[in-house]
């Protein structure tokens, strides 16, 4: 059995706007379905913590950043398409690779 990686993600939003809440809800659904128990998500409101947005060079919201495992990946804007989110963060490839390796060892 292949050990699952832990994913560290940051979601940058601008307040409790409908767009921010939609991004958060969609992302939580994707993470719970695909990565239950192996992810940590930090939500950063750039209106309340602008210094964090500045440090991480965030120019638009919503922005989703995958911090770990490397490499760092970002998606800016619409997070409603599950497959685009997974591909954009290099997570779909990781999951396909792990299932191939675990499935390919049986005789």
Curated annotation (Swiss-Prot):
Keywords: Biological rhythms
Gene3D superfamilies: Glutaredoxin
Gene Ontology BP annotations: circadian rhythm
Short name of one Pfam family: KaiB
SUPFAM superfamilies: Thioredoxin-like (SSF52833)
CDD domains: KaiB_like
The UniProt record lists the keyword Cytoplasm: no
Subunit-structure text: May undergo a major conformational rearrangment; in the free state forms homooligomers. When bound to KaiC switches to a monomeric thioredoxin-fold (KaiB(fs)). The active oscillator complex is probably KaiC(6):KaiB(6).
Note: The kiaA gene has been eliminated from Prochlorococcus during genome streamlining. It has been suggested that the central oscillator in Prochlorococcus does not have to be as robust as in other cyanobacteria because the former live in specific niches of the Earth's oceans; they divide exactly once a day and at the same time. Thus gene loss and changes in kaiB function compared to other cyanobacteria, can occur.
Domain statement: Has 2 forms, fold switches to a thioredoxin-like fold (KaiB(fs)) when bound to KaiC.
Family of the protein in this entry: Belongs to the KaiB family.
Function summary: Component of the KaiBC clock protein complex, which constitutes the main circadian regulator in cyanobacteria; it may modify the ATPase activity of KaiC.
Alphabetical list of PANTHER family matching this protein: CIRCADIAN CLOCK PROTEIN KAIB2, KAIB-LIKE PROTEIN 1
Protein name: Circadian clock oscillator protein KaiB
Annotated organism of origin: Prochlorococcus marinus subsp. pastoris (strain CCMP1986 / NIES-2087 / MED4)
């Amino acid at each position: 059995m292949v050990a699952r990686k832990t994913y560290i993600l940051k979601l940058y939003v601008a307040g409790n706007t409908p767009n921010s809440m939609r991004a958060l809800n969609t992302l939580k659904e994707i993470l719970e379905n695909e990565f239950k128990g192996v992810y940590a998500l930090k939500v950063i409101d750039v209106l309340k913590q602008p210094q964090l947005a500045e440090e991480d060079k965030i120019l638009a919201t919503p922005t989703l950043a995958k911090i770990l495992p490397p490499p760092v990946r970002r998606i800016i804007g619409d997070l409603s398409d599950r497959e685009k989110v997974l591909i954009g963060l290099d997570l779909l490839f990781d999951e396909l690779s792990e299932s191939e390796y675990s499935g390919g060892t049986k005789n």
